[in-house]
């Protein structure tokens, strides 16, 4: 079991989880499940948050996948925790925004020269996968 001991990251995690829980799409997930879902990216500092009035209103995380992990992710929509920083293929995993979604999109396009992503509906059915990256 892995935990975060950095107080700043722990505070971020609490606010990020609250952001997720503010969307019906994530109601079926416990706070613990969401914690473990975003833990690898936070531990590796592969995330960005935007705050308003000292509260997280937008969150994005990404993984650097190797070729095999990328193939697996495209096929299964999942990859192992050890794959989060296994290669040179940047994938944006989650973008969750109450406000400032456009600001987050601009930041991602500025931070990465190219990145890949998958888009899902509210039932987590993936309907669009980037082919060449942005």
What is the predicted role of each segment?
Residues 1-33:
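Short amphipathic alpha-helix that is part of the acyltransferase structural core
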Residues 36-52, 58, 63-69:
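A short helix-loop-beta-strand connector motif used in the catalytic cores of GNAT acetyltransferases and
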Residues 68-134:
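Acyl-donor binding region in acyl/amide transferases
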Residues 21-27, 34-38, 65-74, 98-99:
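Short linear motifs at secondary-structure transitions and domain/linker junctions
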Residues 31-35, 108-109:
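Short amphipathic alpha-helical segment that frequently serves as the phosphate-/nucleotide-binding helix
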Residues 20, 38-42, 111-119:
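Hydrophobic, Leu/Ile/Phe/Ala-enriched alpha-helical segments that form helix-helix packing faces
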Residues 1-5, 60-62, 124:
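Generic structural motif
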């Amino acid at each position: 079991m892995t935990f975060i001991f950095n107080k700043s990251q722990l505070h971020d995690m609490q606010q990020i989880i609250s952001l997720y829980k503010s969307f019906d799409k994530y109601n079926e997930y416990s706070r613990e499940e969401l914690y473990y879902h975003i833990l690898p990216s936070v531990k590796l500092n592969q995330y960005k948050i935007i705050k308003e009035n000292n509260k997280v209103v937008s969150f994005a995380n990404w993984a650097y996948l190797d070729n095999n992990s990328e193939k697996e992710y495209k096929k299964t929509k999942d990859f192992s925790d050890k794959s989060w920083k296994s290669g040179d293929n940047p994938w944006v995993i989650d973008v969750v925004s109450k406000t400032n979604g456009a600001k987050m999109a601009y930041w991602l396009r500025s931070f990465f020269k190219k990145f890949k992503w998958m888009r899902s509906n509210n039932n987590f059915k993936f309907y669009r996968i980037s082919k060449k990256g942005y």
